[in-house]
Curated annotation (Swiss-Prot):
Major site of localization recorded for this protein: cytoplasm
EC number of this enzyme: 2.7.7.38
Record-linked SUPFAM superfamilies: Nucleotide-diphospho-sugar transferases
Subcellular location: Cytoplasm
A matching Pfam family: CTP_transf_3
Gene Ontology process terms (BP): CMP-keto-3-deoxy-D-manno-octulosonic acid biosynthetic process; lipopolysaccharide biosynthetic process
Name of encoding gene: kdsB
InterPro entries listed in its UniProt record: Cytidylyl_trans, KdsB, Nucleotide-diphossugar_trans
UniProt keywords, alphabetically: Cytoplasm, Lipopolysaccharide biosynthesis, Nucleotidyltransferase, Transferase
Protein name as catalogued: 3-deoxy-manno-octulosonate cytidylyltransferase
Species, as recorded: Bradyrhizobium sp. (strain ORS 278)
Family: Belongs to the KdsB family.
Gene Ontology, cellular component aspect: cytosol
Superkingdom in the source lineage: Bacteria
Length: 246
């Protein structure tokens, strides 16, 4: 898998109600979206661009020397926004793989971004994603923590069987906290965005279940820790503290 074949896309919108203007909030002297851009660039796996419908976000990324693509404001999901960005940035179809990195992971370890790619060396895999082992009962019981349920394949890789907000699987053994970072084969992303929302997707409010219900294969790489997302003022202060020390 060569760098020229990989496109890392970071969707960013001004949609947060708990943190208005979240992508542009200052973290260690630059907007949060620029911190995420830097982490993606540090991963050094391929071309990186931000996909947004907001001119202010585009201006901040451009001022930081990053690449940006404007997308429509009415997309029903982040995957649809990513697909529009892919078509605009790479109309010739040179990129075979697309990484979707959330725009609120300013402190993500760049190695975690590259860790999502190895499953796609297997031609049977359509989509790859990440998870980290859960170590507390509180995390297991939290419906805001999505659990990845999978069959071990050896090493740190498993084949996803289900994703759920419930506490699963039942009984003794590890449980895994799903991390919303995805790598798609281009053809898989094209297929995914053409599928209608599925029953389990709508029930669980988890977009990735659409792929599983359609028979697509998702493999999961297990990493050491869940990246710190920024959803609340407390999260923002934590990110500022961590990156001010970097």
């Amino acid at each position: 898998m060569t760098r020229s074949k990989i496109l890392v896309l970071i969707p960013a919108r001004m949609a947060s109600t708990r943190l208005p203007g979240k992508p542009l909030l200052d973290i260690a002297g630059v907007p949060m979206i620029v911190q995420v851009l830097r982490r993606a660039e540090e991963a050094a796996i391929g071309r990186v661009a931000v996909a947004t419908d907001t001119p202010e976000i585009a201006a901040a990324v451009t001022a930081a020397g990053g690449e940006v693509v404007m997308t429509r404001p009415d997309h029903p999901s982040g995957s649809d926004r990513i697909y529009e960005a892919l078509c605009k940035l790479d109309p010739a179809g040179e990129a075979d793989f697309v990484v979707n990195l959330q725009g609120d992971f300013p402190t993500i370890d760049p190695r975690s971004i590259s860790d999502v790619l190895p499953p796609l060396d297997d031609p049977a895999v359509d989509i790859a994603t990440l998870a980290a082992q859960i170590h507390t009962e509180e995390e297991s019981l939290n419906p805001n923590v999505v659990k990845a349920v999978g069959s071990p394949l050896g090493g740190r890789r498993m084949r996803a069987l289900y994703f759920t907000r419930a506490t699963a699987p039942h009984g003794d053994g590890p449980r895994y906290h799903h991390i919303g970072l995805y790598a798609y084969r281009r053809a898989a992303l094209e297929r995914f965005v053409r599928l209608p929302p599925s029953p389990l997707e709508q029930q669980e409010k988890l977009e990735q279940l659409r792929a599983l219900e359609a028979g697509m294969r998702i493999d999961v790489m297990v990493v050491d820790a869940v990246p710190r997302g920024v959803d609340t003022p407390a999260d923002l202060e934590t990110a500022r503290r961590l990156l001010s020390k970097a």
